[in-house]
């Protein structure tokens, strides 16, 4: 049996209660902690089956809904907007706050980041990587600096006319162009989805409002700023050299 507990903590933005959850064996005894950082336009409870699987194997699993996602966003209008100011620093600060609440001196501590969460984890490791037992970077990428800088410039240009909370169809199309085009991107052909080969999960994803909202310009800008940061050599070198890291690519990546 697995026990699930939900709780909140105050975000680094100073005003938002972050929704979080932990899964652990029903006897309360666990051998290590596994923290998950979810991806773009989803929420931590999408990982519930995976978390329950690990808890059944003797791990405590923790994770939270990033700002602008899931139950951390108080209304649908809040979805897709992280925060004013330096959002990437706030986001990784929230990840560290959850770690501080969950880590014990005698238990190994691992972190996993998927998709957008993988970029956040890479940034996190360059700042807070000390003391971890290992990290899993899943579904990440290596983008040229020029691409991220161009994307940020486009966001700024549109925001000058529309504001940072504008949900831009152009940025969405730009973000999900290229290799994404050969996959189903709206759930009409779940057997060819970019998400997973499990068609039941694909159908759930596209029926769930917490997975189908649009990012704001500010969120795209903050994400691209993080992409730019993590691909800089000087920031990669800030990650502890002795930290074991597993890089788990998508099935068609090389």
What are the residue ranges of the model-derived segments?
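Active-site glycine-rich loops that stabilize anionic/oxyanionic intermediates
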Residues: 34-42, 115-116
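Alpha/beta-hydrolase-fold enzymes
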Residues: 121-210
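Conserved small/polar residues in nucleotide/adenosyl-binding loops
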Residues: 253-254
């Amino acid at each position: 049996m697995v026990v699930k507990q939900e709780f909140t903590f105050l975000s680094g933005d100073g005003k938002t209660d972050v929704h979080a959850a932990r899964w652990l064996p029903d006897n309360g005894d666990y051998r290590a902690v596994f923290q998950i950082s979810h991806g773009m336009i989803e929420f931590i409870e999408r990982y519930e089956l995976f978390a329950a699987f690990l808890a059944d194997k003797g791990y405590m699993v923790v994770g939270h809904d990033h700002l602008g996602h899931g139950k951390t966003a108080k209304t649908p209008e809040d979805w897709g907007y992280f925060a004013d100011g330096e959002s990437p620093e706030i986001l990784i600060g929230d990840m560290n706050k959850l770690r501080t609440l969950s880590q014990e001196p005698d238990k190994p501590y691992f972190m996993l980041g998927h998709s957008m969460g993988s970029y956040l984890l890479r940034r996190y490791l360059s700042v807070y990587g000390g003391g971890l037992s290992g990290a899993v970077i899943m579904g990440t990428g290596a983008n040229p600096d020029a691409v991220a800088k161009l994307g940020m410039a486009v966001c700024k240009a549109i925001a000058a006319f529309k504001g940072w909370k504008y949900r831009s169809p152009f940025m969405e199309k730009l973000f999900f162009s290229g290799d994404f085009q050969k996959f189903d991107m709206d759930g009409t052909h779940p057997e060819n989805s970019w998400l997973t080969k499990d068609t039941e999960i694909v159908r759930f994803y596209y029926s769930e409002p917490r997975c189908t909202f649009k990012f704001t310009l500010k969120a795209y800008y903050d994400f691209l700023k993080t992409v730019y940061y993590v691909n800089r050599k000087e920031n990669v070198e800030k990650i502890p050299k002795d930290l074991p890291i597993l890089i788990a690519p998508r099935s068609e990546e090389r």
